[in-house]
Amino acid sequence: MVNNRVQTLLNQLRAQGIKDERVLEAISRVPREKFVDEAFEHKAWENVALPIGSGQTISQPYMVARMTELLTLTPASRVLEIGTGSGYQTAILAHLVHHVCSVERIKSLQWHARRRLKQLDLHNISTRHGDGWQGWQARAPFDAIIVTAAPPEIPTALLSQLDEGGILVLPVGDEQQVLKRVRRRGSEFIIDTVEAVRFVPLVKGELA
């Protein structure tokens, strides 16, 4: 039984154009309050982004749903997430595919995310402390790559780790950011602009 707060959020997401029932089901099954600071628990099921420390945020549920829907996942999809953050987006993905790989630049965030995911009995996830700009070459290629912070341009390493027919979804830009979907067709990459967005920057190189 879905409680009222969850149902209200699902109704909002449908009204905003989210159609994939598998994505909506995953959102209903992941307790967002477990991924936010106690001070923000009362806002956990509101359709807003929230701070998680270290200058990072847990994305607005609409944006999580939109980006996940754009990946057109199947259970067999090999997925790479850049920016584990709180682990919330990771958990949504873990309900949709057999295995998720996730890279986080900030060690403390990676540690807390791993703890939360284990507490929720989500064990089909591999996390790595590393530079998201470099992806995860040892686990490539991927059918789907999702980036939860904005680089000024699309990282070439992520393009090279995308399998034939694969999809990369990411925000791109500095002050003016747009959500892009990149599809690989042989040696070509087809890029679609989806909508204007606002994300924290994808920091290059420096691990924290």
UniProtKB/Swiss-Prot annotation:
Signal peptide: none annotated. GO terms for molecular function: protein-L-isoaspartate (D-aspartate) O-methyltransferase activity. Keywords: Cytoplasm, Methyltransferase, S-adenosyl-L-methionine, Transferase. Pfam families: PCMT. It is an enzyme of class 2 (transferase). GO terms for cellular component: cytoplasm. It comes from the Bacteria. GO terms for biological process: methylation; protein modification process; protein repair. It is found in: Cytoplasm. It catalyses: [protein]-L-isoaspartate + S-adenosyl-L-methionine = [protein]-L-isoaspartate alpha-methyl ester + S-adenosyl-L-homocysteine. SUPFAM superfamilies: S-adenosyl-L-methionine-dependent methyltransferases. InterPro entries: PCMT (IPR000682), SAM-dependent_MTases_sf (IPR029063). Coiled coil: none annotated. Belongs to the methyltransferase superfamily. L-isoaspartyl/D-aspartyl protein methyltransferase family. This is Protein-L-isoaspartate O-methyltransferase.
